[in-house]
Amino acid sequence: MYKFRSKDMSHVFTPIKLNLALHVVGQRADGYHLIESLVYFSLSGDYLHYEPCESDQFVLTGPFAKELISHPDNLVVRARDFMHKTFPEGAHPTFFRLVKTLPVASGIGGGSGDAAGVISILRQQWNLDCPFEKLAKMSLVLGADVPMCLFALEYHQPLLVKGIGQEIIQLKEACSLAIVLVNHGQEISTQAVFKALDKRHHPSLKIDPIALKSVDSLVEALQETRNDLFSPALKMAPQLTQVLSILDECGSLFSRMSGTGATCFGIFKNQQTAQQAALLIKSMHPNWFVKSIMTLGTI
């Protein structure tokens, strides 16, 4: 089993976010796109460690640290500064160490999960008297995926997310899924993908909550859904087709790109078959990011 939050919240494995379905249903006057998405999570992402200290410090390590260093807009630092600014009366200097194990700009919410980890840790460490839902809503300023990642850390459930990420519905009866993640190594800009959309008003996401209760019924229901961002992402990263084909060939029951890419996922019958597929794909493509995970679920 994956390690969840410790009781003293001094460290956390941050959420991996998976958009099993993602429909773009409109665009606001301010340019933000409106989405409807079925989102599953696994608490097996980056490792975030906290300690109190004399002055704010941040250390970045891990296999994908180099890629993140070149991104000046680090979400761990932004989330820390957000908490300092929002709760100055309870704030204290922090030391954070992030072990970056997830690819950067890969469509699985790595940075947003890191930000959510910072907020969750500091909410407890500073003993803040702020309702969770209010804090989650406030965190939207850090990015559309941050509130949903906070919900994953707090409630350990899949979600239905709407709007620009602020409308969150908990799915309290959903099975856990055995998933294999595959990323061929190309970063894809979220902004560029949305900008390249041919149209911004697609049909709404409709999925029967009963379908979430078993792997087979969920896979069947997903056949009637989409990721509307796949088409523009494919133009930027043609290798996505190969990644999806390999997942299918290795026994995936359903394969799709998550978010704006480039990470793709495959749903497998059980954890054992997922782990076997991950080993096979890694042996064929040793330079790819490949990871077998189990998602959060209540069944």
UniProtKB/Swiss-Prot annotation:
ATP binds at P103, V104, A105, S106, G107, I108, G109, G110, G111, S112, G113. Keywords: ATP-binding, Isoprene biosynthesis, Kinase, Nucleotide-binding, Transferase. InterPro entries: GHMP_kinase_C_dom, GHMP_kinase_C_sf, GHMP_kinase_N_dom, IspE, Ribosomal_Su5_D2-typ_SF, Ribsml_uS5_D2-typ_fold_subgr. The keyword Plastid does not apply. Pfam families: GHMP_kinases_C, GHMP_kinases_N. The keyword Magnesium does not apply. It is an enzyme of class 2 (transferase). Pathway: Isoprenoid biosynthesis; isopentenyl diphosphate biosynthesis via DXP pathway; isopentenyl diphosphate from 1-deoxy-D-xylulose 5-phosphate: step 3/6. It catalyses: 4-CDP-2-C-methyl-D-erythritol + ATP = 4-CDP-2-C-methyl-D-erythritol 2-phosphate + ADP + H(+). The active site is at K17, D145. GO terms for molecular function: 4-(cytidine 5'-diphospho)-2-C-methyl-D-erythritol kinase activity; ATP binding. Its EC number is 2.7.1.148. GO terms for biological process: isopentenyl diphosphate biosynthetic process, methylerythritol 4-phosphate pathway; terpenoid biosynthetic process. Catalyzes the phosphorylation of the position 2 hydroxy group of 4-diphosphocytidyl-2C-methyl-D-erythritol. Belongs to the GHMP kinase family. IspE subfamily. This is 4-diphosphocytidyl-2-C-methyl-D-erythritol kinase. The lineage of its organism: Bacteria, Pseudomonadati, Pseudomonadota, Alphaproteobacteria, Hyphomicrobiales.
